[in-house]
Structure formats: C-alpha cells, structure tokens
Regions:
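A short beta-loop-alpha structural element at the N-terminal edge
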Residues: 4-17
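Conserved GNAT-fold acetyl-CoA-binding loop/helix
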Residues: 14, 18-44
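Amphipathic alpha-helical recognition patches that constitute DNA-binding helices
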Residues: 16, 80, 113, 124, ...
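Acetyl-CoA-dependent GNAT
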Residues: 34-88, 99-100
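Conserved catalytic-core motifs of GNAT/GCN5-like acyltransferases
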Residues: 65-68, 115-118, 130, 135-152
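Conserved acetyl-CoA-binding loop-helix of GNAT-fold acetyltransferases
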Residues: 91-104, 127-131
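Conserved GNAT acetyl-CoA-binding A-motif
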Residues: 106-118
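Conserved small/polar residues in nucleotide/adenosyl-binding loops
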Residues: 157-159
Length: 159
C-alpha cells in the first residue's frame, strides 16, 4: 500500500503541478483552459494560502488551490476550487484526500463558501465534490465552446 501525504504546494512543485494541469487540459472535460500559464501568472491568480499537493509515495500526484471569485470585501470568504489529479494516479482516492484537506485549510483560513465549476461530462469530479460535501446549486448552459466548437455546460457546486 502506498503512502499518501498532503502538504502545502511549494514553487519548486510547479514542474509536476503544470504537468498534471496539462493532463487535465488534455481530457477536454476538466477546464476551459487550453494551455497552462507560466508560474508567475498562475501564482498571481490564486490565493497565497490553501495551495496543496498530494503525494503518492513521495511523488506529486495531484494539486488543489483556491482563487477568489470577486475582489469586493463582502466576498472575501468565497473562493473557487481548482483540483487536478495526475492521469496515472486517478481512481485511487487521492482527490478525496486532497479536497477534504483543502476544505479544512480553507475553513481555518476564514473562507465560508467554496464553489467549484464542474463541466457536465466530468462525472468523476462531480462525484468527488458530492462525496466531499459539496451540493449542486445550479447549472449554466451554453457557457462556452470547446476547441471543437461544441457548446459546454457546467454545474455549480458549493460547500
């Protein structure tokens, strides 16, 4: 049995984190993004706290982070979740370890609402969020087009 560890993400994790992000992008059902930004852009768009990686026997196998949904003071406790698990590590429960740790850390950091945008055809992510206590609060149709011109829809989940 492998050893699972969740720890804060460090800048030196970026090579592994960006590789995992690119794997998620390649699925075409994890994000609207079509490329991975450079670290400086990613770093500027995510909160300083609540950045985690999950390790499987010492190897970075996934990551999770938050970004604010709105800069206004009244929304200071609301953040959007990003969570990705590497292709060869999927289906092992690592996402559950990572998302539950992120939710705990977010609560300790003063966040009162976490939201997640999940593409409708991403059943594993929907299941993970529901298992971790998120609930579906809405759906947005024809929100974006993918690289093939197909309309995408998303579900919104909150915890």
């Amino acid at each position: 049995m492998s050893e699972i560890t969740v720890r804060p993400m460090m800048p030196e994790d970026w090579t592994a984190v960006s590789k995992i992000y690119l794997e998620g992008i390649a699925t075409e059902h994890a994000t609207f993004q079509t490329n991975c930004p450079p670290y400086t852009a990613w770093d500027a768009s995510h909160t300083r706290e609540c950045r985690l990686v999950v390790l499987d026997d010492g190897v970075v196998a996934g990551w999770a982070a938050l970004h604010r949904v709105d800069p206004r003071w009244c929304y200071r406790g609301v953040a959007e979740v990003s969570i990705y698990v590497g292709e060869k590590f999927r289906g092992k429960g690592l996402g559950y370890h990572l998302l539950t740790a992120l939710c705990r850390e977010a609560e300790q950091a003063g966040y009162w609402t976490l939201q997640s945008t999940v593409l409708q055809d991403n059943a594993p992510s929907r299941g993970l969020h529901l298992k971790c206590g998120f609930r579906v609060v809405g759906r947005r149709e024809r929100i974006a087009r993918d690289c093939h011109g197909r309309w995408l829809e998303i579900g919104r989940a909150h915890v």
